[in-house]
Amino acid sequence: MTRCIHCSRCVRFTDEIAGYQELGMSYRNNHVEVMPFIGKTVDSELSGNIIDVCPVGALTSKPFRDTVRSWELSRRKSITPHDALGSNVQVHVDKYHKVVRVLPLENETLNECWLSDRDRFSYEGLYHEERITTPKVKQDGKWVEVDWDTALTYAAKSINGVKMDHGSDAIGVLASAISTTEELHILQKMMRAVGVNNLDTRLDQQDFSGDGKLQGVPYLGSSVSDFINNKALLVVGSLLRQEQPLVMQRLRQATKNGSELHLMKKMFWLKLSLKSRSIRGRLPIPWGKF
């Protein structure tokens, strides 16, 4: 921290934006240090943004540090894959086409200039040693690596075999909900070509009784940027700090602006401003108004 100029921007970010003051200024004069509270760590889901707000580079990204020079990187615009918000990001790629850093791309209607930690650092999973990067076919009870032509031929024969024996309705396809639109389009096009129409991405949903009543996309006609202007907001069955930290940040700004926040969930772990005081803790109530 020898570069630190004690501007306290990181401290203010954790308090004013992230909502959890996990950093503070200790000691006095030229001995001042920025540090977490004794025995504590920085656990905010938005903590990576303090790297961006630091004006002198005293706070850096550990996975990226000392890997490549910034001017050697190519920059690609993209969308975050880990939430439904569609936050804009800038993916930095080195000369070997390897992703080495992900930064937020400013979009005031979505993520503003912030980014959640899971979208900032999850690129490391692309190169994890346990990630499967080549197709595998099970032979004699063991998984054997094969080329793509062999794997696709094997899959086609297996699908056609089930179709011939049991009909196309006996085949179902479940895809990840975080797949890209292009990936899902190719998958459904391929499966419909062989007569399979049972496709879905709702891996966790158990009750489908209300699907027939849905018309179009369940959209309420409001964007996250409108939260600050709403008089009241309702959150149903979601722990936003973990599931949608950027939405939670928007809700905090709305409550600071005077909006009422209503929550419907069995247990909560929140810190939301309420006039001159704050509420923080686990509240065993089915309905809360803050």
Enumerate the predicted regions with their spans.
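Catalytic alpha/large subunits of respiratory electron-transfer oxidoreductases
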Residues: 1, 6-7, 11-12, 17-18, ...
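Aromatic/His-enriched, Gly/Pro-containing loop or helix-boundary segments
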Residues: 32-46
